[in-house]
Amino acid sequence: MRRQPPFLLAVVAILLAILVPAVWKVVERLNRPVGPTTGGEPWPGDEPVWHTRHAEFIADSQNGGYDVVCLGDSLTWGWDDHRDVWAERVTRRRTTFHAIGGETTNGLLWRIDHGELDGLDPKLVVLLIGSNNRWVKDDPDDIAGGVAAVVGRLRERLPRANVLLLGLLPQGWTADASSRPVFAEVNRRLAAFDSGPVSVRDVGGCLLEPDGRLSQATSTDGTHLSRGGYERLADALGPLVRERVGD
């Protein structure tokens, strides 16, 4: 049998040394999950703005001195544009809003696990999270389980704080919108968490018309709130927050 030239064997060896690890990296990447499998699994967001805001919130937490910390998704983020409404109708106590558009329980868990609450010692945490989980896993048990995981993490990280857990707010213009029964089931499950320092309140009815519709008086797109929506929400939240932290 003819022997291969030494230089050819050397080239083959070099190619194998380069290609085999690369192939294994591809295989490993293909075997990795592309997202969380349950609502209680910490998982970071994949958008640059998500990581930017997380870093901003870490820096904000180092300032400390907040009486109220509000955590959530775009519905909580919207308070940034209506801080005057919050101050006039909810409380003038020092409040910060740590919220990211499109956030899920997974992302919020990851943020908590990676320093976002470090330096904070609030009297109250207002939590509104879970509606975006529906786009990951449309299952009330899983969504409620994710919210429960967040509440548990808050109790671990901020043991002196009370938690005001809000039920998912209604979405969809009409009373028969597909999200309504899912959110109603989630809220029924969340009610079971009402105990001790954790208070659960379903205030979403304040946003609806008598026939169950969302209207442009409270919503901009059937999901997010208009100024009128934040005013109604503030009137519902005001007594709950002031009872826990004062005016």
Could you tell me what each predicted segment is?
Residues 1-71, 76-82, 242-247:
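N-terminal secretory targeting modules
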